[in-house]
Amino acid sequence: MGCLGNSSKTAEDQGVDEKERREANKKIEKQLQKERLAYKATHRLLLLGAGESGKSTIVKQMRILHVNGFNPEEKKQKILDIRKNVKDAIVTIVSAMSTIIPPVPLANPENQFRSDYIKSIAPITDFEYSQEFFDHVKKLWDDEGVKACFERSNEYQLIDCAQYFLERIDSVSLVDYTPTDQDLLRCRVLTSGIFETRFQVDKVNFHMFDVGGQRDERRKWIQCFNDVTAIIYVAACSSYNMVIREDNNTNRLRESLDLFESIWNNRWLRTISIILFLNKQDMLAEKVLAGKSKIEDYFPEYANYTVPEDATPDAGEDPKVTRAKFFIRDLFLRISTATGDGKHYCYPHFTCAVDTENIRRVFNDCRDIIQRMHLKQYELL
């Protein structure tokens, strides 16, 4: 009995335990409430779009503009990726010279051994970037035949940053090379999986989710649809004369339009508005002004397209460029206005993802829209 009596707690002890439990519960509830409020206050943005549209570049811009950019160690880690871009670019161009129809010969036959060297190192994954490699790349890039093949890059699969890095081969080859922010923005690395970037603008928290755009990556998107404030859909406008990597047949811009339509009409996303980034405006302008690839050859309806009266061109913009960019904008708006249910809206913006000032201005313009979507999301509007 004595032992039992000693092990049992007095009413006073039990009261103390109960009080401690209540205090602990109160602290937990307070923390949970704090987390709920923080979650509700966060704007979650989902970046969607077809492969190579510029989604990851937008994320990099958010880091440059709103996080602290890239530290020296991160820049150092990107050197190998940038040099790999150089290798991929020159291998692709040199290999395409004999496969495109009609084929393109080297302008200087003395460069043949350089071309053979580049083709021989193509399959090597763990490649050492020697001075010999960079010298061959530089000489080949100066060859007018290689340049002529590059000009026909819509006929094969070439990364967008090819010209940018090939023109900067002298700096990229330096032993003490340090990539600039622009180099990091241009660097192409395939996005696989889901990447989250967190940043704050004027004390407002943003979580941006970047998902791979290639067809086999899209099944992962559904994981990100829960509680999204807005979708930022990125479309590469300059891709009107290109085909996708996945099948080497489907027009890239058509693929982007079809994907946009499937997202717009997705029953799980009927109340989520889309901010449309009509990207790669710089490359679109270059193609249109070069006049080699006519939009009407790929989109016959362009022949009868008239620019809307309310269209506002950029200062000094060529009318041909204005017509092209608004035509592509209207292809997307035709999809978003077809339903007309008033449950979600499409807000188009012309962007150049590698231009930091352009993205700063566009994102600032979007913040009011995102705020309204956020208030609507939690029925505060």
Swiss-Prot record:
Binding site for GTP: E52, S53, G54, K55, S56, T57, L185, R186, T191, G213, N279, K280, D282, A353
Region called G4 motif, residue ranges: 275-282
Membrane-topology descriptor: Peripheral membrane protein
Region of interest (G2 motif), ranges: 183-191
Signal peptide: none
Region ranges (G1 motif): 44-57
GO cellular component, one term: heterotrimeric G-protein complex
InterPro entries: Gprotein_alpha_S, Gprotein_alpha_su, GproteinA_insert, P-loop_NTPase
Lipid-anchored residues (N-palmitoyl glycine): G2
Listed Basic and acidic residues bias regions: 10-25
Record EC number: 3.6.5.-
Compartments, as annotated in UniProt: Cell membrane
Region span, G5 motif: 351-356
Any GO BP annotation: adenylate cyclase-activating G protein-coupled receptor signaling pathway
Annotated positions binding Mg(2+): S56, T191, D210
Record note on disruption phenotype: Mice are anosmic and show a striking reduction in the response of primary olfactory sensory neurons to a wide variety of odors. Most mice are unable to nurse and die within two days after birth. Surviving mice are fertile but display hyperactive behaviors. Females exhibit inadequate maternal behaviors.
Region (G3 motif): 206-215
Modified residues (Phosphothreonine): T178
Catalysis: reaction(s): GTP + H2O = GDP + phosphate + H(+)
A GO term, aspect molecular function: GTPase activity
Lipid moiety-binding region (S-palmitoyl cysteine): C3
UniProt subunit comment: G proteins are composed of 3 units; alpha, beta and gamma. The alpha chain contains the guanine nucleotide binding site. Interacts with GAS2L2. Interacts (GDP-bound form) with RIC8B (via C-terminus); promoting GNAL folding and association with the plasma membrane.
Family membership noted in the UniProt record: Belongs to the G-alpha family. G(s) subfamily.
Role of this protein: Guanine nucleotide-binding protein (G protein) involved as transducer in olfactory signal transduction controlled by G protein-coupled receptors (GPCRs). Contains the guanine nucleotide binding site and alternates between an active, GTP-bound state and an inactive, GDP-bound state. Signaling by an activated GPCR promotes GDP release and GTP binding. The alpha subunit has a low GTPase activity that converts bound GTP to GDP, thereby terminating the signal. Both GDP release and GTP hydrolysis are modulated by numerous regulatory proteins.
PANTHER family noted in UniProt: GTP-BINDING PROTEIN ALPHA SUBUNIT, GUANINE NUCLEOTIDE-BINDING PROTEIN G(OLF) SUBUNIT ALPHA
Protein name in UniProt: Guanine nucleotide-binding protein G(olf) subunit alpha
Organism, scientific name: Mus musculus
Lineage, broadest ranks: Eukaryota, Metazoa, Chordata, Craniata, Vertebrata
